[in-house]
């Protein structure tokens, strides 16, 4: 598969699958495929949960309602065990993060050539279908969490309390203010960076492994047979990875917001 219709080398095949459909240049580059799939999956999540909630019954629930209730209960229990403040926004936020990130991660389970081949048939040269393999997407979510951390830190502690937290911890002495400020600022900035890079790194690596396995199908029958076995094994293992990464992103968000609500 190639944008030009010519056969690709293994290196070109990998590069093609890791290239976004984009417009613009430099800082103003927009990754159309990442935006399309992330927004589309977000809308699908909202529609699905809204529909289930609207049709929910106190009688014998259907399979979909049971599944949704199980997810909601799991997230709600996670919030109750981790978040020590009182904020009605946290549980819905955690639910949105967990399901949305999982759905974006789940796109990695689709065979790597299926959607790009359909896009090629429609005249679209590139199509990267896993939004969480795009740093722009993971950083945008992490920055959103970071802004909430700042907002609730100031709301709960006040401006003076937030400034005091940055300047008087961990060493509670005026002479250590520069050191405290440096340490606390680095710690604060590290939160969104670690959130974004952890999710991106794990999903990008998983996608790359699927691409490398797909390359084996174009070799000989022995490698093709091995590729089938490897793909099945990695598929099963990767289900755990995509679920775990969604859970970690959700839990770290809850922990960070819980820390923001702690008034020292």
UniProtKB/Swiss-Prot annotation:
Keyword Plastid (UniProt): no
Subcellular location per the Swiss-Prot or TrEMBL entry: Cell inner membrane
GO cellular component, one term: proton-transporting ATP synthase complex
Bilayer topology: Multi-pass membrane protein
GO molecular function: proton-transporting ATP synthase activity, rotational mechanism
SUPFAM superfamilies, sorted: F1F0 ATP synthase subunit A
Domain of life: Bacteria
One GO BP annotation of this record: proton motive force-driven plasma membrane ATP synthesis
Transmembrane residue ranges: 32-52, 89-109, 134-154, 177-197, 208-228, 235-255
Keywords annotated in UniProt: ATP synthesis, Cell inner membrane, Cell membrane, CF(0), Hydrogen ion transport, Ion transport, Membrane, Transmembrane, Transmembrane helix, Transport
Main location per the UniProt record: membrane
InterPro entries referenced in this protein's UniProt entry, alphabetically: ATP_syn_F0_a_bact/chloroplast, ATP_synth_F0_asu, ATP_synth_F0_asu_AS, F0_ATP_A_sf
Subunit details: F-type ATPases have 2 components, CF(1) - the catalytic core - and CF(0) - the membrane proton channel. CF(1) has five subunits: alpha(3), beta(3), gamma(1), delta(1), epsilon(1). CF(0) has three main subunits: a(1), b(2) and c(9-12). The alpha and beta chains form an alternating ring which encloses part of the gamma chain. CF(1) is attached to CF(0) by a central stalk formed by the gamma and epsilon chains, while a peripheral stalk is formed by the delta and b chains.
Function statement: Key component of the proton channel; it plays a direct role in the translocation of protons across the membrane.
Family statement drawn from the similarity comment of this UniProt entry: Belongs to the ATPase A chain family.
UniProt name for this protein: ATP synthase subunit a
Gene name linked to the record: atpB
């Amino acid at each position: 598969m190639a944008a030009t219709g010519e056969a690709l080398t293994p290196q070109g095949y990998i590069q093609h699958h890791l290239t976004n459909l984009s417009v613009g240049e430099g800082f103003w580059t927009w990754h159309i495929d990442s935006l399309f799939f992330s927004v589309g999956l977000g809308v699908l999540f909202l529609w699905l949960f809204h529909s289930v909630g609207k049709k929910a019954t106190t009688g014998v629930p259907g399979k979909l309602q049971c599944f949704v209730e199980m997810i909601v209960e799991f997230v709600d229990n996670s919030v109750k065990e981790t978040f020590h403040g009182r904020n009605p926004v946290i549980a819905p936020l955690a639910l949105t993060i967990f399901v949305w990130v999982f759905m974006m991660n789940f796109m990695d389970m689709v065979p790597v050539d299926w959607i790009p081949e359909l896009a090629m048939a429609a005249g679209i040269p590139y199509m990267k279908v896993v939004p969480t393999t795009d740093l722009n997407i993971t950083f945008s979510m992490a920055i959103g969490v970071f802004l909430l951390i700042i907002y609730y830190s100031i709301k709960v502690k006040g401006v003076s309390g937030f400034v005091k937290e940055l300047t008087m911890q961990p060493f509670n002495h005026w002479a250590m203010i520069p050191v405290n400020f440096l340490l606390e600022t680095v710690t604060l900035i590290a939160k969104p960076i670690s959130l974004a890079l952890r999710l991106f790194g794990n999903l990008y690596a998983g996608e790359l492994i699927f691409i490398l396995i797909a390359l084996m199908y174009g070799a000989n029958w022995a490698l093709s047979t091995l590729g089938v076995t490897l793909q099945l094994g990695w598929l099963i293992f990767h289900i755990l990875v995509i679920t775990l990464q969604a859970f970690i992103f959700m839990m770290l968000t809850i922990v960070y917001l819980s820390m923001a609500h702690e008034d020292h």
